[in-house]
Amino acid sequence: MSERPAAGETRFRRMNDLPSTHLLGAGTAMCAGCGGLQAVQEIYDVLGERTVFVNAAGCMTLLSIYPFTPFRGSWLYTAMACAPAGAQGVRDALDLLVAKRRLPPEEDLDVVVLAGDGASYGMGLSATSAAIDRGLDFVYVCYDNEGYGNTGQQSSAATPHAARTATDGGAGFPGAKKDLFAIWVANGPSYVATAIGAEPLDLARKVEKARRLRGSRLLLVLAPCPTGWGFEPGEMAEIGRLAVATGFWPLKEWERASGRVVHTKVRRPRLPVEEYLRRQGRFRHLFEPARDARRLAEIQAGVDAYWAGVA
């Protein structure tokens, strides 16, 4: 593996420090303006070419279609619920090759799971928990587009309250988004962080930190989805910035070594949540034909309550 930065150091202090050569090829079969693809591109650039991706069935499956895969490295495709088990097999095989001196330690690979929110929040959560319990040395990346985007944007455990999906009526999703960050932290991995591709420096620093550590390291990345959320592809980056600026998507990290949650980007004052919601078709029913003041106030109150608890 390439040399890792010392603890507390970062290569990424300014935008100019971000990689200028991209490892993920262009011309993929993904939807135009895919926020998940943007994040994967940025993550891959920081991790480097010596990476094995283990993909849970989902949107990113479209990247693995032979002979059009844009990855320079290796890719393993698994069913939706078992990507961490696939990562265990890859990690065990690499460790065995190193132990038998068939693979020099400096040529070892990072094992990275790619999974959507359907797998991460739902049917694959038990496999992830078991991998953390075993102390599996891997990076887990959830690209969270807040629904089953690959099959038509049905609601998932990641869908926010009131968002319209293919499985909910005109009033939108009646439930609330599951706090996967807290669930992962409760399992006791080495590192957990939230991120978004629209904040590339923050994302790069977190990927760099995750790569430096050992054990189970988990990244929860919001992935604005023009197809499922209802906005123009060219608005993807702005939607991502608004998710952070309104406080709807907190950027934070937790390390087992410190046991503390640290917020890495805090906007004060925050923009009203409406500025984020009104740009998305999945929330249009909150504004048209009449403004739903009660539900909008409920959503804003939920965001305010979260930040009231942040020191």
Located regions from the model:
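Conserved thiamine diphosphate
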Residues: R14-L18, G27, E107, A157-K209, ...
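Cofactor-binding active-site loop characterized by glycine-rich and histidine/acidic residues
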Residues: G8-Y140, Q153-P160, G170-P174
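Structural signal for hydrophobic packing residues in well-ordered secondary-structure cores
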Residues: Y44-T51, R91-L97, G175, V185-G188, ...
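Flexible, low-complexity linker and terminal segments
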Residues: A223-A311
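Basic/polar N-terminal segments that are highly enriched at the extreme N-terminus
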Residues: M1-R13, A311
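Short gly/pro/ser/thr-enriched loop/turn and capping motifs at secondary-structure boundaries
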Residues: T61, N145-N150, P226-G228
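Short, well-ordered beta-to-alpha junction loops that form the rim of enzyme active sites
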Residues: A56-G58, V221-P224
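Short, conserved beta-strand edge motifs with alternating hydrophobic and charged residues
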Residues: C142, A193-A195, L218-L222
